Amino acid sequence: MDLFDFFRDWDLEQQCHYEQDRSALKKREWERRNQEVQQEEDLFSSGFDLFGEPYKTNKGDALANRVQNTLGNYDEMKDLLTNHSNQNHLVGIPKNSVPQNPNNKNEPSFFPEQKNRIIPPHQDNTHPSAPMPPPSVVILNSTLIHSNRKSKPEWSRDSHNPSTVLASQASGQPNKMQTLTQDQSQARLEDFFVYPAEQPQIGEVEESNPSAKEDSNPKSSGEDAFKEIFQSNSPEESEFAVQAPGSPLVASSLLAPSSGLSVQNFPPGLYCKTSMGQQKPTAYVRPMDGQDQAPDISPTLKPSIEFENSFGNLSFGTLLDGKPSAASSKTKLPKFTILQTSEVSLPSDPSCVEEILRESQHLTPGFTLQKWNDPTTRASTKMLEDDLKLSSDEDDLEPVKTLTTQCTATELYQAVEKAKPRNNPVNPPLATPQPPPAVQASGGSGSSSESESSSESDSDTESSTTDSESNEAPRVATPEPEPPSTNKWQLDKWLNKVTSQNKSFICGQNETPMETISLPPPIIQPMEVQMKVKTNASQVPAEPKERPLLSLIREKARPRPTQKIPETKALKHKLSTTSETVSQRTIGKKQPKKVEKNTSIDEFTWPKPNITSSTPKEKESVELHDPPRGRNKATAHKPAPRKEPRPNIPLAPEKKKYRGPGKIVPKSREFIETDSSTSDSNTDQEETLQIKVLPPCIISGGNTAKSKEICGASLTLSTLMNSSGSNNNLSISNEEPTFSPIPVMQTEMLSPLRDHENLKNLWVKIDLDLLSRVPGHNSLHAAPAKPDHKETATKPKRQTAVTAVEKPAPKGKRKHKPTEVAEKIPEKKQRLEEATTICLLPPCISPAPPHKPPNTRENNSSRRANRRKEEKLFPPPLSPLPEDPPRRRNVSGNNGPFGQDKNIAMTGQITSTKPKRNEGKFCATFKGISVNEGDTPKKASSATMTITNTAVATATVTATAIVTTTVTATATATATTTTTTTTISTITSTITTGLMDSSHLEMTSWAALPLLSSSSTNVRRPKLTFDDSVHNADYYMQEAKKLKHKADALFEKFGKAVNYADAALSFTECGNAMERDPLEAKSPYTMYSETVELLRYAMRLKNFASPLASDGDKKLAVLCYRCLSLLYLRMFKLKKDHAMKYSRSLMEYFKQNASKVAQIPSPWVGNGKNTPSPVSLNNVSPINAMGNCNNGPVTIPQRIHHMAASHVNITSNVLRGYEHWDMADKLTRENKEFFGDLDTLMGPLTQHSSMTNLVRYVRQGLCWLRIDAHLL
């Protein structure tokens, strides 16, 4: 106790010494603070919100809550810190507790030692006697902490005053407490002054020499105020003060303990208060952000940031400079955080700041200059390249002492100066507005730079700026964070993430300067930035699109080889790529490249999905599921090529130029991708070409962004331009395996260049040829088949839909084709190339009137064929129909021959577009189909061959092989048609069976389609062409949803019911696909069950049983009943095994209980009225008995009950199936002709028919119903 009192008194005396030395200055400072900060202090004491309104407005309360949770409630801290009595209590130096405090202080002192290296030696020697000096140390720490700093003078004095019981000092400190802001600035000075005084006290008792030695470095690092203190005080004292601000040594010494505690050499109470102070400083990080956002609202906080920069120096500055860097520094040394916070409070005493600034300038003029210049320089140096190079330097600098760091910082500063002239005009202005976001992103550095820029004009700001600069110099020397930054580190890390994300989204182009400013201390920041880059690399992906641009720009600006030059380059890049998000820069130069590559990969991948489907998610859309995947794979493989192409800087500029027109697009690109994959794919392909040829003008916004990403990410323009072949090869090789059958698909899925080329091919080869053929054969003689004409129009639409569905990318192509086709059809009518037609033939077979030969000879042959048809009921030739995936199932509404002509032309065109892909399928499908009747046992393939030879120009050759021979004038074709006419009905049914993939139903105009029934009556109805291609369940699900939504939008009940029935067919296909794929998550039974409900609902829309029901209603009811019957039967088959098991179990159970049941009156008969016999009660299993004995003598186990219920449900499906089938048979009798034709065309439907046959049969019937009801 005596020693403690002695030292405390001695500390007070030391305070008196320093006060005498500094009394005039302190008084001036206090007076100025009282005048300037009184209002701010009142606000603070009255509950001033640490998180300035602007900050909260921008970030919302969630961030404040999170900060409070992480760092503690500032309001609580504020009370403790701002309340003098609380401070005394926290300090725990009351006279009564003084003896205890020394002991407790030893522990806190360790933490302060961590913060302030000087303290540890002091504490080591004088922990018992150091209680007062530790408070002084605590004061420094608290001074470093804004709130701590405010209360710190009080604490120092309080710690001394309690020990010395000096009322004058105690009263003086409360006064200081009253002027918190003033006290803060003074407190800082006092911390420098009083603290040295206290330190000498501690130093005497404690070993201050080692700490003084350590402090010498921080002093040189630019803490002028401390330097003065050092000069006036023992080096030990000065060391303590300087190191607290953040000398590298102090940081290292504090590093280990800092994580443990923010405690500074405080008594136990003080220790707690220190922790609170740390929390408060942490909270100050946010006020700093608030200041940057609204300096007017929280001017004190803003200067405090400056002080933080000066005191917290490296740690706080780095944290502020870039929260990314803060994150890295945090990981490295969280200790500096508290120092930074404490510095925040001092900004309001300009004189102290100026003095410190002058001292710091003397100590480290280079750093001061750098810091002054840093606002702009930082903006320029913020470049990731600088950060990267600096990061390596900083890694060295962290362990290195201030001088070394200063040198490095000076060099960096010089580099920044070089780049600065360019960026300064742009970045500085941006820097000022940007600091708020910068503060968020980069913490104090942004605010410090901003304050520095503003501090020149404002004395308060100046002090803070000077401090920040001074701190900045040491900060550069020691990028390590303050030890108390453990909490703050979390906050900063979180803020960094938030700010980086916000910047990436909010600050497109402006963020670059902002980020530059926010990262103004790139010298120190590099390590932190690198750390943050690593941590934020995951965040960066959100901005991958822009990164490729950044990387390209950087490459372009990289002509300078030196790392310092990269800063200038970075500045240039920033200027040129202001649109790039801050996060891109934040990533850091090192990471950015990798990240950019990854990003480019991702971006490149995005364009693919977009091309593949309307939405990136849909890129695996039914038709192109495999192709998009292949393409994605290609993109995944492409990263390496991208890495290589990046070296091509000159090309990157070209990309940049191209991007320039589309820069706006990056944002819209996502929307564009989502909006339409077709447009994206087209644009991407076009973009590629445009990039090569017309990059600035043609590139579409969204597409441009994609192309940029594709080019930048996967390849630089040079690689795309120079190695476009290789790039195409890569994409082609990747895509070809997937799309090899269809170059068109490949082009769409492949890189833009390849896509563009494919587009050319599609336009020239496919469109022209197809158009010429289709009109030539189909359009001329559409008239012969009246119903056929109507259906012809409908058929092309469906076919187009089918093909489009299969090829999401062709959608865009289709968009272009329709107009071109209309224009080209007349032009190309007469051009018929047999080989081309054969190649172009799509899988879909659409019967076209055989009367449309473009040539006179063809016309004659068609006439002959027509005559023959009329005489022999020859079927019309089949022709490929246009692919329109969205409409593939909808029959075109054109009922007139003109519709047929157009449709035929369109069919030719569209077919040509998709033929490559479909050719193989079509041929295979057709070959797979065999004609079973009479002369038609020969397979479609053989017929196809014959027709191909005979019909030179018909695009329908392969599909029409059996039927279209009539079109050809050759006798062979005639013979073929003759043989096939007798079996037209069977052929058509077999063809549809083989070719129709119930998902693809397209109507073809059957000109004079003779459906040969047993009576050989002429049945002329359009027949849908079905594609045999297999799709996954998702594809059918999407189709079903489209139809269902279409039905939902209709008001006419019959049309609604028809569409619901059609949707039910798609759902049925989906269930069938689920059966094929055992990996499907959903049970096909469930799908069928839901389909049944939809059909039942559709049937309720129209009361077919009503006497007012029309034939159409009854026909629809028949089709629905057929579907229901087969669905029920199918559901039973799916559950048949379960039903068998249940049946066996139930039979066994009943056998076992037969005797018991005989003895007991049946509960069904007695209804539970009979009193159970004791025997029956005994027979009941107490465990299994689920029934109530009062209700009957027999109880059924729950297990048996469930089995019986399930068995009934399963077997009831069979009953329902037969019931509905019988109902359909009854209704069919009223429309024998309609269903006779349908059976003739599609083949009779039985209860054993497959789901595919059912779907095709019913869909064909629905098509006819639509035609009859004029719904097409």
Curated annotation (Swiss-Prot):
Molecular function as annotated in GO: G-quadruplex RNA binding
Subcellular location: Nucleus speckle
Sequence ranges of Basic and acidic residues compositional bias: 151-160, 212-223, 543-558, 616-629, 818-829
Biased composition (Basic residues): 630-640
Modified residues (Phosphothreonine): 478
Record family assignment: Belongs to the AF4 family.
Main location: nucleus
Keyword annotations from UniProtKB, A to Z: mRNA processing, mRNA splicing, Nucleus, Phosphoprotein, RNA-binding
Residue intervals passing through the bilayer: none
Name this polypeptide is given: AF4/FMR2 family member 2
Function as written in the Swiss-Prot or TrEMBL entry: RNA-binding protein. Might be involved in alternative splicing regulation through an interaction with G-quartet RNA structure.
Comp. bias intervals (Low complexity): 439-452
Spans annotated as Disordered: 93-183, 200-223, 418-491, 535-687, 779-829, 842-903
Disulfide bonds: none
UniProt modified residues of type Phosphoserine: 391
Organism: Pongo pygmaeus (Bornean orangutan)
